[in-house]
Amino acid sequence: MNKAIVLVVIAVVAAVGISSFALTSINSDEVTPLVQELAVLEEEISILGTTNPFSAPTTIAQSMQAAQPAPNVTIGDDGKIYVLYQDTVNEETNIFLKTSTDNGKSFSTPVRVNLLDGNVALDGRVAPTIQLGDNGEVYVTWANSRYEPNMFMGNYRQLVFTQSFDDGKSFEPSIIIGAEELASGKYFQHMSIDGYGGIHMAWLDGPAKMNATGYMEKDESRDRGVRYVQSLDGGVTFDTTKLIDANACPCCNVQTAADGEGNVYISWRKVFGSGDTQVRDMVVAASTDGGKTFSGPVKINDDGFQFKGCVHVGAPMAIDSEGTLHVAWYTGATDHQGMYYATSTDNGQSFSEPMPILTGDWVPPQRIFIAIDNDDTVWLTWEDATGLSTNEKAWRYGDTQALIFTAQVIDGELIRADNPINESDAKSLTNIDSDNGLVSIVWTETDNSVKIAIAEN
């Protein structure tokens, strides 16, 4: 691909309070030793500034009734843009898909993805995931929710999957992932597709059981943690789910990545130790056999983030044409808190020295996302809530405002735009994607609109 246009999709929605502390105590587990040094300070690396290349955003969709806090985007090999967004009317949340074939200048009429009305959990922390097949297939997964008074925060979530065989013009009836297995709540899910059309999902799993009153409650006899499942027939059937790790932060995002060489990666925030001194650092587990088996967790960096709670942010990943794994993440470690970027050239067995993206004495927990274009240029986008956070110095992703910045990594240098691309305070950045000369970014802001902006590179 010749990188010609950078496309930004901005889903601008009313800010909603979505986070709360989830204090837990989890025993430590073994982890593969780390081989790199701690991150260097920001001023010690080359950071080149550039002007913001993005045009003013234009509106794709508008909601006046309720927030739609978790949009998502993907781009086809032909440059067609697919934008998912949620809309809530009369307390019923549904997912809609719009597409564009002219680089975002115009979009199709919306198609509702979920056939069962209101079968969607409204959660700005976790966007519905969309992936594309090679023959007009569109795959979407999300979580639904029902009231269960004995479960954490009173809700029980299931993982829902659907597919379209006509390029998103219509969708099939959805299925529940793991419906034939023992009951468990599924949270902070993510889905990837590999080069052969294999579908890979991972999530945080909370085993549950029915009690004598007819309500669900935690099942303490089974391990909670990160679980994984795959489908090798385009979502017609899914394998039995498998436990990847039992010592995961119970409310930080899980991320996946897969390529056409049999490599599948899962990242999550793992808990080491217990009590007030426990550490919650980002790790990656790797499979080189298409998801049949996975390595033990490897720390991306030995951050040593001591925190007995959840920051609600994960470590998104992308794989370039040479098979290098690229990852970005947030840490609240006292001596180097902020957002970082690193790579692995040995299938996740070790990681490079982290490159600081945003650091400071206080960096609120915010999201960072990553994509790689067809020229293997790395694109990063992140929220910067410095001075805007309503969380003060609480390590959690919560109800705050943020500015959205972008950068590229070229030949080891960070080329960062000097100005944010959003016109208003953003809320809940959810994805970045690239293909066919386009790079698309989606996030939420404060006026309930879905917008798009384009910049030529």
Which stretches of residues belong to each language-model region?
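Positively charged n-region of N-terminal signal peptides that target proteins for export
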Residues: 1-4
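Extracellular, repeat-based ectodomains that mediate carbohydrate processing or recognition
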Residues: 7, 13-457
